[in-house]
Amino acid sequence: FSCTGGTVAENQRVTLTIDRSQITGKAAGQFAVVNEHIQEGTGAANIIVEVDNTPVSYPKGTFVEANGCIAMEAQHYTAKWDVPGGGFALLKPYGRLGTALKVFPATANFENSEERPYLEYTFAAAKDGNYHVQFHMSATTPVTFEPKQYIGYSVNGGAVQVVNTVHEENRPFFGSEQWYAEGFANVKLTEAIILCHAGVNTLRFYAVSPAIILEKIVLWPDGTTLPESYLGPRESYSC
């Protein structure tokens, strides 16, 4: 710890430095913060920092779960597959994070195609089980008056799941509550549940409908909740 004791009047940053050569497996350290101006026994907080130094070997580009989630920016894929009808291209600067991926030509539609462009991401899950996957996309609208704008995804080589990003399929998207909400927040969010295994997994994001622009993907274990924030969690560490 950069500071092991003292009194703070306004604020002070404490830096924790870890020598991983001295740690085998898992370890934890803690320090206490006490408010001296209120009744004894109240106003204290114990801060616990856990470290996992278990030896692992992941392929290059693998995102590692930490702090209860995995966050991957769209540009940091491990594989990209284009087809004769179109392919993903980088947009920069663009969106809330500065970069995004979009299929060109802009009117390319793969709804009825056997081959679709995709981006592949590699991540390491901490445990077996269900995970939430949340796709962060730009706040675009369908290119037709039909209330549909599809994306596709698959996990670990499984079947492609096609999802409509439009929530209400019985009314026009333009002017709907979702249209207004996405415009104000400047993001389109679509979420699903996927089955992962402990260790390395692969996730593919498929282009289906036109005008879909991917900015980020976030995963977290089922049964847990992400802290609320405007941009979502920062991008995770990758090997």
What are these model-derived regions, one by one?
Residues 1-239:
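Extracytoplasmic
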